Regions:
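C-lobe/activation-segment region of protein kinase-like
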Residues: 189, 199-294
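Juxta-kinase regulatory segment immediately upstream of eukaryotic protein kinase catalytic domains
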Residues: 2-48
Length: 294
C-alpha cells in the first residue's frame, strides 16, 4: 500500500508522455490483430506503460518491470506488525512477468463480475495489451477529481470523495475486492461509470475476502485522509458510515477493530520531514478515532 507512487506508469488519466499514443514507426496491423501488435511493440517500448493506436482504437501496452523492493512498503509493514493488523500488512508487488500474469487474471475476474476494468486484449510473457477505459476519450482519476473539488469547497470535495466510496462498495457488492484501492486507481470514464486499474498484486492470495475488503476501505481512506480531514471530517463520517451500512458484519467489525488498534497513530509527528506516508497514516488514524470513538 503505497499511494505516494503517482508516476506515469499507470493505465489511465495520465499526464505527460504516457498520455499520448506512442508513435508507430511501422504500419499498424489490421484492427483486431492485438496479439500481433503486442508481439511487435513489446520489445520496442521503453516505458512500462504506453498507449498505441490500432486502426481507430486506442490500446495500452504494459510491459513487465523490475521486481519491486521491500523497502517501499517499510512504513506500513512496520505499523501492521506493531499493531498485529494483517489487513494493513502490504502485499508485495512481485514485479516482472509474475505481476503481468496476476494483473491479467484479476482483470478477467473483475470483468466477468461486471465491473469496469480494462479488457485484456492479448498477453504474452512479459507483456499485456489492454483496452482503453475511456474508449479513446479522456478519463479523470478520483485523485484528480478530489484535487479539483478541494478548490471549490468542502461540499464539492465530499461529493467527489463519496463517488470513490460508492465505487468501492459496488465492487464489494459483487463479492469481489480490488488490490490497491487508492484514489489514483479509481477512474471516471466518459459515461460517468468509475473504472478500476492497477492489479499487479492480489491480496486474496494471502487474506480472506473480509480482510481484502477492509484493505480496500483503509487504502482509500489512507490516500484521501489528508484532504478529507482538512475539509470536513465530521460530514465525511456520515458518508463513511452510510456506505459501511451495506458492508458485511465481518467487514464492519474488522474496520472498528482496526480503528481501535490505530488510535495511537494519531500522535505520529506531523512534520513533512517524516514523509507523506507518515502524514497519511496519522490523518487516517485521526479520522478513524473520531468516527469510532466510544
Amino acid at each position: 500500500m503505497n499511494p505516494a507512487r503517482r508516476g506515469p506508469t499507470r493505465v489511465a488519466a495520465r499526464k505527460g508522455a504516457a498520455s499520448a499514443p506512442a508513435p508507430l514507426d511501422e504500419q499498424a496491423p489490421q484492427a483486431g490483430h492485438y496479439a500481433e501488435l503486442l508481439r511487435r511493440m513489446l520489445p520496442k517500448q521503453s516505458q512500462t506503460v504506453a498507449s498505441h493506436r490500432l486502426g481507430n482504437e486506442r490500446v495500452w501496452l504494459k510491459k513487465a518491470g523490475p521486481r519491486h523492493g521491500q523497502w517501499r512498503y517499510r512504513v506500513l509493514a512496520l505499523i501492521a506488525g506493531a499493531l498485529r493488523l494483517d489487513v494493513l500488512r502490504p502485499v508485495p508487488n512481485p514485479g516482472g512477468s509474475e505481476a503481468i500474469l496476476i494483473e491479467a487474471r484479476r482483470l478477467r475476474e473483475l470483468g466477468e463480475a461486471g465491473l469496469r476494468v480494462p479488457v485484456v486484449l492479448a498477453e504474452q510473457p512479459g507483456g499485456l495489451l489492454m483496452s482503453d477505459l475511456g474508449q479513446g476519450r479522456a478519463t479523470v482519476s478520483v485523485l484528480e477529481r478530489l484535487e479539483q473539488a478541494a478548490a471549490a469547497g468542502p461540499a464539492s470535495l465530499l461529493a467527489a470523495w463519496r463517488d470513490g466510496l460508492d465505487a468501492i462498495a459496488a465492487v464489494h457488492a459483487r463479492g469481489a475486492y480490488l488490490s490497491q484501492a487508492f484514489d489514483r486507481n479509481l477512474v471516471h470514464c466518459p459515461d460517468g461509470v468509475i473504472g478500476y486499474i492497477d492489479f499487479e498484486d492480489d491480496p486474496g492470495m494471502a487474506l480472506g475476502l473480509a480482510e481484502c475488503q477492509v484493505r480496500d476501505w483503509l487504502s482509500y481512506l489512507h490516500s484521501t485522509a489528508m484532504l478529507v480531514r482538512a475539509a470536513a471530517p465530521q460530514a465525511a463520517a456520515e458518508h463513511w458510515h452510510a456506505v459501511q451500512a451495506d458492508a458485511s458484519d465481518a467487514v464492519r467489525e474488522r474496520i472498528a477493530h482496526a480503528a481501535q488498534r490505530m488510535r495511537w497513530l494519531r500522535h505520529l509527528p506531523s512534520g513533512r520531514r517524516w514523509g507523506r506516508d507518515t502524514q497519511r497514516v496519522r490523518a487516517s488514524a485521526r479520522l478513524l478515532n473520531r468516527w469510532y470513538s466510544r
